[in-house]
């Protein structure tokens, strides 16, 4: 769930997240128990409980990590000069985050009802704010509506294309390059 520039986690917490996402994808969130997660990990339920008190805590942890990657991207991008090279790098990092976190996004899509009961609305509002910030970084906060729409189209289409083609593409790097090219073409430096 981390792209280049962020620190990957190889600890128990990350392993729990990975296994939980696998089981949620296989069985659904509602049909997966903490016991099953612990069994797949090869640990006791008590050991799992030490890290996470509930499935909801696990979900919050991996969604928070995913959204934190976007926060880091926006914070970094705000410190950069507004150039074509920066714009391309911002889009490349964004595409990397989307590709790295595709399992999280799939979970969110497949388990909407469960997510709605988890008080996740604040997290999604925060994520929408980060997307607004990303658009500001790409075209400027005072850009005309046409430029902002082009930037949002580029960002949203890039994310959707990554998720749609990831399992269909033979070459993940080629997919990333194509999506980056498409997104970059949608946002000229001056509109």
Q: What is each PLM-predicted segment?
A:
Residues 144-166, 172-186:
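Hydrophobic alpha-helical segments that form the core
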Residues 106-109, 117:
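Short, hydrophobic secondary-structure boundary micro-motifs
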Residues 64-71:
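Short, basic, alpha-helical segments at the C-terminal edge of helix-turn-helix-like DNA-binding modules
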Residues 15, 19, 23-57, 61:
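Helix-turn-helix
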Residues 61, 74-106:
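Hydrophobic alpha-helical connector segments
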Residues 71, 116-152, 177:
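Amphipathic alpha-helical packing segments from all-alpha helical-bundle domains
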Residues 1-11, 164, 168, 191:
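N-terminal intrinsically disordered/low-complexity leader segments
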């Amino acid at each position: 769930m981390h792209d280049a520039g962020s620190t990957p986690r190889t600890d128990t917490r990350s392993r729990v997240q990975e296994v939980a996402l696998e089981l949620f994808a296989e069985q659904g969130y509602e049909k997966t128990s903490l016991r099953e997660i612990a069994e797949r990990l090869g640990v006791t339920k008590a050991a799992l409980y030490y890290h996470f008190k509930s499935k909801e805590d696990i979900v919050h942890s991996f969604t928070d990590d995913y959204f934190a990657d976007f926060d880091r991207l926006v914070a970094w991008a705000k410190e950069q000069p507004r150039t074509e090279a920066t714009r391309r790098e911002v889009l490349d990092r964004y595409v990397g985050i989307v590709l790295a976190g595709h399992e999280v996004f799939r979970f969110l899509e497949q388990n909407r009802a469960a997510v709605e009961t988890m008080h996740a609305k604040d997290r999604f509002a925060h994520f929408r704010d980060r997307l607004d910030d990303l658009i500001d970084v790409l075209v400027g906060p005072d850009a005309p509506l046409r430029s902002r729409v082009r930037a949002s189209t580029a960002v949203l289409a890039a994310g959707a294309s990554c998720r749609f083609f990831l399992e269909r593409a033979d070459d993940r790097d080629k997919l990333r390059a194509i999506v980056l090219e498409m997104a970059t073409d949608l946002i000229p430096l001056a509109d």
